[in-house]
From Swiss-Prot:
Record's signal peptide: 1-21
Coiled-coil boundaries: 200-224, 250-274
Gene: Egfl7
GO molecular function: calcium ion binding; Notch binding; signaling receptor binding
UniProt domain EMI: residue ranges: 28-109
PANTHER family associated with the record: EGF-LIKE-DOMAIN, MULTIPLE 7, 8 (PTHR14949), EPIDERMAL GROWTH FACTOR-LIKE PROTEIN 7 (PTHR14949:SF21)
Cell attachment site (motif): residue ranges: 131-133
UniProt keyword annotations, A-Z: Angiogenesis, Calcium, Cell adhesion, Coiled coil, Developmental protein, Differentiation, Disulfide bond, EGF-like domain, Repeat, Secreted, Signal
Pfam families, alphabetized: EGF_2, EGF_CA, EMI
Name the UniProt record assigns to this protein: Epidermal growth factor-like protein 7
């Protein structure tokens, strides 16, 4: 018994011995019947060729387009000869399709005219699938990722032909994924060498500052002492919080100040009075 590999080799040997692969086509998907009623001849024809090139589109964007040139090519044509009996049907790939990777009988490769540019792939006749960064019927237009919002640059986006890149402010560089701008790593700072006598001076300044802090804490306790006293006396006066007691105390002080002014006024009046002696 032959294996599948041996059968495939034998099949290609038969094709090579026959000198042609036209007879291996059979009516199937993307394979069409070509009626022949005469012999074949070689003829010339004018063939269109599309040459891609880069140009500038609106908005100063780079676009890939094509120019059309014409050249002389050769092809096999079939002519009907008078008096000859029509030959049996022949088969070939339908218009818009060609053989897949040179294999006979398999018409699975689509044909796009003009061809797809910028590494685009022809998925069906006249239809291209464009790679990332390109768009258009033949993948000839550059996608501006910075304007469409597809770019994920944290600070500044720079569009390029078929792609983009992120730019950070001076002193920063983009992260590996391009999402963040990180500070550039510089040389490690060198610790300054200690100067003789500086340690004792700093220690003395620390002691002075600590003494000043202690004095301020004592003054703060003196200022807060009356408030603590008011807070402890608030339940005695039926007040709910120290703030209410403080307001009540201020009212009492206002009354005392008013009485003091009245006493001072009476003292002035008494000083201006004089008693008359009886004669």
């Amino acid at each position: 018994m032959w294996g599948s590999g041996e059968l495939l080799v034998a099949w290609f040997l038969v094709l090579a011995a026959g000198g042609t692969t036209e007879h291996v086509y059979r009516p199937s998907r993307r394979v069409c019947t070509v009626g022949v009623s005469g012999g074949s001849i070689s003829e010339t024809f004018v063939q269109r060729v599309y040459q891609p090139y880069l140009t500038t589109c609106d908005g100063h964007r780079a676009c890939s387009t094509y120019r059309t040139i014409y050249r002389t090519a050769y092809r096999i044509a079939y002519r009907h000869s008078p008096g000859l009996t029509p030959s049996r049907p022949r088969y070939a790939c339908c218009p818009g399709w060609k053989r897949t990777n040179g294999l006979p009988g398999a018409c699975g490769a689509a044909i796009c005219q003009p061809p797809c540019g910028n590494e685009g792939s022809c998925i069906r006749p006249g239809r291209c699938r464009c790679p990332v960064g390109w768009q258009g019927d033949t993948c000839q237009i550059d996608v501006d990722e910075c304007s469409t919002g597809e770019a994920r640059c944290p600070q500044r986006c720079v569009n390029t032909v078929g792609s983009y890149w992120c730019q950070c402010w001076e002193g920063q560089s983009p992260s590996a994924d391009g999402v963040l701008c990180l500070p550039k790593e510089g040389p490690s700072p060198v610790a300054p060498s200690p100067t003789p006598g500086v340690d004792s001076v700093v220690r003395e300044e620390v002691y002075k500052l600590q003494a000043r802090v202690d004095v301020l804490e004592q003054k703060l306790q003196l200022v807060l002492a009356p408030l603590h006293s008011l807070a402890s006396r608030s339940p005695e006066h039926g007040l709910q919080d120290p703030g209410s007691l403080l307001a009540h105390s201020f009212q009492q002080l206002d009354r005392i100040d008013s009485l003091s002014e009245q006493v001072s006024f009476l003292e002035e009046q008494l000083g201006s009075c004089s008693c008359k002696k009886d004669l």
